[in-house]
Curated annotation (Swiss-Prot):
Its cofactor is pyridoxal 5'-phosphate. This is L-seryl-tRNA(Sec) selenium transferase. It is found in: Cytoplasm. The modification N6-(pyridoxal phosphate)lysine is found at residue 284. GO terms for cellular component: cytoplasm.
Length: 448
């Protein structure tokens, strides 16, 4: 029997799958049939089933056509969850950017002079006012900000950093590697657990361009430890006529609840110290879109803008509009338009109400409402727990975790129980979450 002759014709398969666009279907048919021919040649395929071939091609096509990025319900309790997209954008703020994205806008056009303008002028104006800096610049993320600053001011020169701040954050982003790639010469001072201001001063040479301080994202050093304060570093930098730069990583504006402000000061306190340059992420505690926000002296920001590398880190009108709208919300103290802040500021009483609502909609669920702890996330406030409320589900924790994940609900296992943390569950997601739970319970009853 000639298996090659049993392979269905391309046009026959196309007729069976007319609901799939040809631009997707045709190459998948060709690839699948080529795999079958190869399988026949090497003896791995000994029979042909036309129906199975069509189903395989249909499945592969649907995988291409199905959206890869989908909405999930974040029930982990982590507000700034990097793997789940970090900060949410308020619908009103999104509409602000949408209007400027679906129409032409004055992105790089000076309406007064009638000629080409500066795309960074928009953000510099509002961010400088918000943060109290001389100027500001936005790039596509904080890693880009770090690279741009080092490349502009410390290329082929020395940048002094504490050994305790040579961190690695998510995605294998290592400060020493970024410094090397930027052309800056890393000078390590102090030890992992202790670095004094004298260590910085002793390391300064005629080749020193910068004293750099790095936020220790995702970890903290406690016990027998000490570090030079930002104020000390700024004072020393001014004294020695070199730059000071703080890679803050994340920044917030209003004072945070649960004593979080005691561990890290708000950006307003940092800017009062008059630093040369500061940078942080736009999608962490600031609560906006992914971006690297650079604040500092106007002459330094102007030099950054002249670096040709900035072109590679340039942000578009959507990012600029979202940052601008978020900044406006802060200026007007409309904190309810910052979902990240809303999540962090929720009281345990409010979280309990959400948990009660969920249980009222899931009468068949065996669960308890319990108090627990969670973290802000996104490398901010490492090891600083905040109170939360969870719905602790009885039963096989691993099975519940898998079943919920199949329905795009991401929770966590705590004390060998699957829990849904109400701090990160949105109010308008409660009913949908209840429907998912009820459908899982119904399936379990049918399978029993």
């Amino acid at each position: 029997m000639n298996l090659f002759r049993q392979i269905p014709k391309v046009d026959k398969i196309e007729k069976a799958l007319t609901h799939i666009p040809k631009k997707v279907l045709t190459p998948i048919i060709q690839k699948t049939l080529n795999e079958i021919r190869e399988g026949i040649k090497n003896g791995k395929i000994t029979q042909i089933n036309e129906e199975d071939i069509v189903k395989t091609i249909e499945k592969r096509s649907e995988e291409i056509l199905s959206p890869s990025i989908v909405n999930v319900i974040n029930a982990t309790g982590i507000t700034v969850h990097t793997n789940l997209g970090r900060s949410l954008i308020d619908p009103e703020i999104f509409d602000y950017a949408k209007k400027r994205s679906t129409h032409y806008c004055n992105l790089e056009y000076d309406l007064e002079k009638g000629k080409r303008g500066d795309r960074y002028h928009h953000s510099a104006k509002i961010l400088s006012h918000l943060f109290g800096s001389e100027s500001a610049l936005i790039v596509n993320n904080n890693a880009a900000a770090v690279f741009l600053i080092l490349n502009t001011f410390a290329k082929d020169k020395e940048a002094i950093v504490s050994r305790g701040e040579l961190v690695e954050i998510g995605g294998s982003f290592r400060v020493p590697e970024v410094m090397k790639a930027s052309g800056a010469k890393l000078v390590e001072v102090g030890t992992t657990n202790k670095t004094k201001i004298q260590d910085y001063e002793d390391a300064i040479t005629e080749d020193t361009a910068m004293l750099m301080k790095v936020h220790k994202s995702n970890y903290s050093i406690e016990g027998f430890s000490a570090e030079a304060s930002l104020e000390e570093i700024i004072e020393l930098a001014h004294k020695k006529n070199v730059l000071d730069y703080y890679d803050l990583g994340s920044a917030y504006i209003p004072k945070l609840p649960y004593s979080l402000t005691n561990y890290e000061p708000p950006i307003s306190e940092i800017m009062k110290l008059n630093p040369s340059l500061v940078s942080f992420s736009g999608d962490k505690l600031f609560g906006s879109v992914q971006a690297g926000i650079i604040l500092g002296k106007k002459d330094l920001i102007d030099k950054l803008k002249k670096n040709q590398i900035l072109r590679m880190f340039r942000v578009d009108k959507i990012t600029l509009s979202l940052i601008e709208a978020t900044a406006l919300a802060y200026i007007k103290e409309e904190y309810d338009k910052i979902p990240t802040l809303k999540s962090i500021f929720q009281t345990t009483e409010a979280l309990k109400e959400k948990a009660k609502k969920l249980l009222s909609l899931t009468p068949g669920l065996k669960a308890e409402i319990k108090e627990s702890h969670t973290y802000v996330g996104g490398g901010t406030m490492p090891n600083r727990k905040i109170p939360t409320v969870v719905v602790e589900i009885k039963g096989n924790a691993k099975k519940w975790e898998e079943d919920m994940r199949k329905h795009l609900v991401i929770g966590r296992i705590e004390n060998e129980k699957f829990v849904l943390d109400m701090r990160s569950v949105q109010e308008d997601e409660i009913e949908k979450l209840a429907q998912i739970i009820n459908s899982i319970i119904t399936c379990e009853v049918k399978d029993a």
